[in-house]
Amino acid sequence: MAHRFPALTQEQKKELSEIAQSIVANGKGILAADESVGTMGNRLQRIKVENTEENRRQFREILFSVDSSINQSIGGVILFHETLYQKDSQGKLFRNILKEKGIVVGIKLDQGGAPLAGTNKETTIQGLDGLSERCAQYKKDGVDFGKWRAVLRIADQCPSSLAIQENANALARYASICQQNGLVPIVEPEVIPDGDHDLEHCQYVTEKVLAAVYKALNDHHVYLEGTLLKPNMVTAGHACTKKYTPEQVAMATVTALHRTVPAAVPGICFLSGGMSEEDATLNLNAINLCPLPKPWKLSFSYGRALQASALAAWGGKAANKEATQEAFMKRAMANCQAAKGQYVHTGSSGAASTQSLFTACYTY
C-alpha cells in the first residue's frame, strides 16, 4: 500500500522549479567548472602550466570575469569546493561575481567512486554521509543546485544489474537530500564512452540506466520539476571503428530519452564525454533538430568542451586574458545556438576546438 507523506511544501517546489527552469531558459546551458585539483592539474599540464592554487584561481577568474552578456548563453556554473570560496584579484568571491551576472551557482557534491565487490571493476559513488549538512551550508553560501556523477561502463558483463541499481538509488537519495535543502539536483548517470561498442549497444544500455534512475527517483519521492538530467549522448565507444553522423547520434539519443525520461523534467543538459568542442556542439544541434517529440529543454553542461580553446589561448599568461575570454565566449554562444537548433558550422573554429578531449576512465 502506498502512503502519501508530502516530501516538500508548495513553496519549496516553487523555488526548485524556478531555479531549474532559469538555468535552461532560452538556450542557456551550464559551464561545468567543478574539476578536482588533480583533474585541473591534468588540464594545466597539457599547456605546460604548473598546477598551483593560484594558477587554477587565475584561469577561473578569467572565465568568470567575462562580459556580462555571457548570461545569454550560460545559465549556471558548477563549482568545485575550492572554487566556491576563491576570490578575484580585487577580493570579490567568484560566486558573487557569477550571481551579479544572473548566473546560478552550483556545486559538485559526490566524493568519487568506490569499488563494488563481485563485479567487473564497477563502482558506486561516495558522498551520502553528511550530505544534508553540506547541502545546508552550501545553500547558506549562495549555492542553488548540486551535481552528482555516477559512472557506468560498457564491457564484459557491464553494466551489471547491481551497478545500475546501486548507482540509481544513490542518485535518487542524493536528489532527495538536495531538494530538502533547497538545492536543485543535477542527476548525472554517465555511460562512459570507453570501449568499442556500437551506437545501438550504447542506446540499449542508456535506456536501461535511465529507466532505473527514474524508477529510483520516483521511489524516493523526488520532485521531477525541480531537477535537471545530465546524461551522456548516445554515441559509439571511442574505439569503435564505425563512425556515425550527428543525425544518427541525435536519433539514438532522443529515442532513448523519449522512452525513459518523463516530460515533467524541465531540462536535459548533456555532458560532452570527451568529444571535441566542435563535435559536442554539432551533436547538440542535431539533437535539437531531431524530428521526434522533445518535451524538455535540450541543452549542455560542458566542461572540457567549453574550456579547451580557452585554456589553449591562455597558456598561463595574463597577457592572453582577452583572447581567452573571446575563445570561451565563442564556444558558449555556439552551444547556445545549438541548444536552439540554430548552429551553423563555419569551418573556422580553430585547431583546439576539433581535437578529441577523450580520456580513458575519466574522473572529475
From Swiss-Prot:
N-acetylalanine: modified positions: 2
Reactions catalysed: beta-D-fructose 1,6-bisphosphate = D-glyceraldehyde 3-phosphate + dihydroxyacetone phosphate; beta-D-fructose 1-phosphate = D-glyceraldehyde + dihydroxyacetone phosphate
Site positions (Necessary for preference for fructose 1,6-bisphosphate over fructose 1-phosphate): 364
Principal location class: cytoplasm
Compartments it resides in: Cytoplasm, Cytosol; Cytoplasm, Cytoskeleton, Microtubule organizing center, Centrosome, Centriolar satellite
Record-annotated active site: 188 (proton acceptor), 230 (schiff-base intermediate with dihydroxyacetone-p)
Binding site for beta-D-fructose 1,6-bisphosphate: 43, 272-274, 304
Pathological association: Hereditary fructose intolerance: Autosomal recessive disease that results in an inability to metabolize fructose and related sugars. Complete exclusion of fructose results in dramatic recovery; however, if not treated properly, HFI subjects suffer episodes of hypoglycemia, general ill condition, and risk of death the remainder of life.
PANTHER family in the record: FRUCTOSE-BISPHOSPHATE ALDOLASE (PTHR11627)
Protein name: Fructose-bisphosphate aldolase B
Organism of origin: Homo sapiens
